[in-house]
């Protein structure tokens, strides 16, 4: 499971071995995950514990790095929640919670343009182009195949 360290009451309870989800004031670039008092937190804890899963809280810097990693390796520009997912998987793999021989499915459903303002300082400028293949080719300096 994934949680952002600026908003990770479920991960905190997991680390403490507690069933009590203590509300927090969210502070994260991952706005879609900024839920300081998750209604289903206890159920999330139960699922992780009953399946032998793991939880991790990641920093905003790790979120941005997760987004960059996904863009660089898969060509996918995910929103910040997707960056949280990748950063968490990376952390759990480094900690040995996820083993190299395991198959893992990571759901990335939100496009990076949804949260561009949160990562703009880390990603550089964006280009606005006309909605045409020629404009796309020109923006990326791609020559038409003959």
Regions inferred by a protein language model and the residue ranges of each:
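Generic beta-strand/beta-sheet core signal
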Residues: 3, 36, 58, 79-81, ...
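Glycine-rich phosphate/pyrophosphate-binding loop at beta-loop-alpha junctions
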Residues: 1-50, 111-119
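Phosphate-binding loop/pocket of nucleotide- and phosphate-handling active sites
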Residues: 22-24, 86-146
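Short, low-complexity, polar/charged sequence segments that are solvent-exposed and flexible
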Residues: 19-22, 52, 74-77, 123-127
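Exposed alpha-helical structural elements
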Residues: 9, 28, 43, 62, ...
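Active-site-adjacent helical/loop segments in soluble small-molecule enzymes
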Residues: 39-99
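Short glycine- and Lys/Arg-enriched binding-loop motifs that mark or flank ligand-binding interfaces
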Residues: 28, 32, 71, 78, ...
């Amino acid at each position: 499971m994934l949680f952002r360290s600026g908003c990770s009451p479920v991960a905190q309870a997991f680390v403490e071995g507690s069933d009590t989800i203590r509300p927090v004031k969210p502070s994260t670039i991952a706005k879609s995950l900024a839920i300081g008092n998750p209604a289903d937190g206890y159920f999330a804890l139960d699922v992780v514990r009953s399946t032998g899963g793991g939880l991790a809280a990641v920093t905003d810097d790790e979120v941005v790095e997760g987004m960059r990693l996904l863009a660089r390796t898969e060509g996918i520009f995910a929103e910040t929640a997707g960056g949280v997912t990748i950063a968490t998987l990376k952390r759990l793999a480094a900690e040995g919670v996820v083993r190299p021989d395991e198959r893992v499915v990571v759901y990335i459903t939100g496009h990076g343009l949804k949260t561009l303002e949160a990562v703009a300082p880390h990603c550089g400028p964006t280009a606005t182009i006309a909605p045409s293949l020629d404009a796309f080719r020109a923006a990326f300096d791609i020559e038409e195949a003959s």
